[in-house]
Amino acid sequence: MATRRDLVVGLAIAPTIPLLARSVFAQEAEATPADKLETSQLVYITPIKSNGEESRCKAEIWFIHHDGDVFVVTPPETWRARAVGKGLTKARLWVGEFGVWTQSDGAFRDAPEFMARASIEAHADVHAKVLAAMGEKYAQTGWGRWGQRFKDGLVDGSRVMIRYAIASGGQQVDE
């Protein structure tokens, strides 16, 4: 049962709730796209076709922001890896967490956005650094299950690492 004291304390702090909420929203609004690369668990990716249009294929995927670029690990038969193999190296990336892209009702499109140039990263030393960083980032969200698969896959060819070099200013990617 609530006491008179509980009521008085509740009434005393109630006016501060909107101020606290505004402060939290203001901090979120002040976050830059680069900040989101450090805090988000997912990036949404689509290749840009040769005619300049986005591919119909998009996906949400684990990533790591390392040395200014975004890295993902994926099977070589996925559309994002095949696009790079076909020379479709321009890509658009959105950073945020909206669940499965097909069920997000396009919400990811309002997230911070980057244009990037994709390439297959083949250097074992880069693989090791990126996987170590991913292990730290995803330690609580499934790395125990996926980390060794990523590492083994990069060795046996069942996975590739894609580097997305973010365009200067995040906007245009030169030809």
Q: Language-model features: where?
A:
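N-terminal secretory signal peptides and thylakoid transit peptides that target proteins
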Residues: 1-15
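Short beta-strand segments
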Residues: 40-76, 93, 113-114
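Short, structured beta-strand-loop surface elements
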Residues: 79-169
